[in-house]
């Protein structure tokens, strides 16, 4: 297959999707055998490789050790790891990176991946975060209520939001004035979960957008600490500029500033063609 890609179809680069849940099946155990086989063949064929570093699929052993780290929606329901339409290995939508054990485990996987693949001449670039967005929100985009698309309401994310508010407003009095509330302490502040006022929603989404930006920075810095040669790339949905950002919680322009190469996914025939086409409708 790779020979046909290189010689018959004249491609010069391929993409590999490296799933955390598949490559790290047990604590401290990594199996990159299949990845290295492909890379070795690409070395011989002169093909370059765009390596997808996918931590949106967390290992089941990690969920078992830290069930409290599951994403939580606005209704208070936690999201168990499962398969998804684009991911047959399971582990979706990963676990919340606001929990230190989860972030540490993800960093270990990214470092180990970079250590192994960076030895190969065919290794060209990392897809640091495939179509970045708040993962469970994206997966539920077409088949859930708004409450079930809003994340994350786990205790660590709420605590981080409270700290962010403290840094933003300085005093509880200033926050209470801006939000038209009378809070007795920072600890009782809960993010908005349904229709209500605007200013608390704006702050909550600003916080989540900053959180996504910092997660991208974490991924970039972790990979770059091991591999100083390969390009760091990411890309958004083709319609990223008009995504429901309140749900996806990203600022593509902020994310792009962290990357060496930035792009987008574009599938002209995917889902509803008029949505991604400038062609006018016929009468």
Which residues fall in each region the model found?
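Extended, compositionally biased low-complexity polar/Lys-Gly-rich tracts
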Residues: 1, 6, 258-262
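Acidic-and-aromatic substrate-binding clefts and catalytic sites of carbohydrate-active enzymes
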Residues: 1, 21-33, 58-60, 134, ...
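Polysaccharide-binding and catalytic clefts of secreted carbohydrate-active enzymes
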Residues: 74-112, 116-253, 258-275
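Aromatic-lined substrate-binding rim segments of carbohydrate-active enzymes
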Residues: 2-85, 103, 107-118, 215-231
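C-terminal substrate/ligand-recognition segments
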Residues: 259, 280-283
């Amino acid at each position: 297959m790779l020979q046909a890609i290189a010689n018959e179809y004249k491609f010069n680069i391929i993409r590999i999707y490296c799933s955390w849940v598949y490559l790290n099946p047990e604590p401290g155990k990594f199996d990159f055998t299949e990845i290295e086989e492909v890379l070795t063949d690409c070395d011989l064929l002169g093909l370059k490789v765009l390596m997808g570093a996918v931590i949106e699929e967390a290992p089941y052993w990690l969920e078992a050790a830290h069930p409290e780290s599951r994403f939580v929606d606005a209704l208070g329901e936690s999201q168990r790891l499962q398969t998804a339409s684009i991911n047959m290995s399971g582990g979706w939508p990963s676990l919340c990176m606001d929990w230190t054990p989860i972030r540490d485990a993800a960093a270990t996987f990214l470092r180990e991946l970079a250590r192994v693949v960076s030895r190969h001449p065919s290794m060209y670039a990392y897809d640091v975060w495939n179509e970045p967005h708040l993962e469970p929100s994206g997966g539920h985009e077409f088949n859930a209520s708004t409450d079930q698309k809003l994340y994350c309401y786990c205790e660590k994310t709420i605590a981080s939001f409270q700290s962010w508010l403290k840094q933003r407003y300085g005093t509880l009095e200033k926050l209470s004035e801006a939000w038209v509330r009378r809070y007795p302490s920072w600890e009782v502040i809960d993010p908005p979960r349904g229709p209500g006022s605007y200013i608390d929603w704006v702050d909550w989404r600003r916080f989540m957008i900053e959180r996504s930006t910092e997660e991208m920075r974490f991924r970039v810095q972790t990979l770059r600490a091991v591999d100083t040669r390969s390009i760091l790339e990411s890309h958004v949905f083709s319609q990223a500029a008009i995504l429901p950002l309140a749900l996806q919680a990203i600022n593509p322009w902020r994310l792009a500033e962290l990357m060496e190469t930035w792009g987008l996914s574009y599938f002209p025939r995917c889902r509803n063609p008029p949505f991604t086409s400038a062609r006018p409708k016929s009468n």
